[in-house]
Amino acid sequence: MSNTTWGLQRDITPRLGARLVQEGNQLHYLADRASITGKFSDAECPKLDVVFPHFISQIESMLTTGELNPRHAQCVTLYHNGFTCEADTLGSCGYVYIAVYPTQR
C-alpha cells in the first residue's frame, strides 16, 4: 500500500485528491493516481459518486474555453451539491490536479 497523496494538497479532511491526465480538452481519471485522505461518511459517499463526474465535466469545459490553461498555474474553485472542488494545472502541460471535499461551513 502506497502512502502517496495525490492531487492538490489541502489541510482538509476528508478529501479526494487526484492527478487527472489531460488529453486535449478531455480528462482521464486513473485510480492509481488518486488518494483519499480521511474518511467520507456513509451519507457523503453516494453524493461524491454524483458530484465527481459533474466536476470533471465543468473542468473540461473550462479547458475548452481557456478559463483553465494547461501552461499556467491558476486554481479554480467549483461548488456542487455540498462539495467543493479545487482544480489547477500547476502549469504542467498535461495534468490537472484536484482536491474534492465536503464544503466547509
UniProtKB/Swiss-Prot annotation:
The keyword rRNA-binding does not apply. Induction: Expressed in mid-log phase at considerably lower levels than antitoxin relB. It comes from the Bacteria. Coiled coil: none annotated. Disruption phenotype: Single deletion has no effect on expression of cognate toxin ypjF i.e. the probable operon is not autoregulatory. Single deletion leads to increased biofilm formation, deletion of 3 type IV antitoxin genes (cbeA, yafW, yfjZ) has no effect on cell growth. GO terms for biological process: positive regulation of cytoskeleton organization. Keywords: Toxin-antitoxin system. It holds the Pfam family CbeA_antitoxin. Antitoxin component of a type IV toxin-antitoxin (TA) system. Antitoxin that counteracts the effect of cognate toxin YpjF. Also counteracts the effect of non-cognate toxins CbtA and YfkI. Encoded in prophage CP4-57. Belongs to the CbeA/YafW/YfjZ antitoxin family. This is Antitoxin YfjZ. It comes from Escherichia coli (strain K12). The gene is yfjZ.
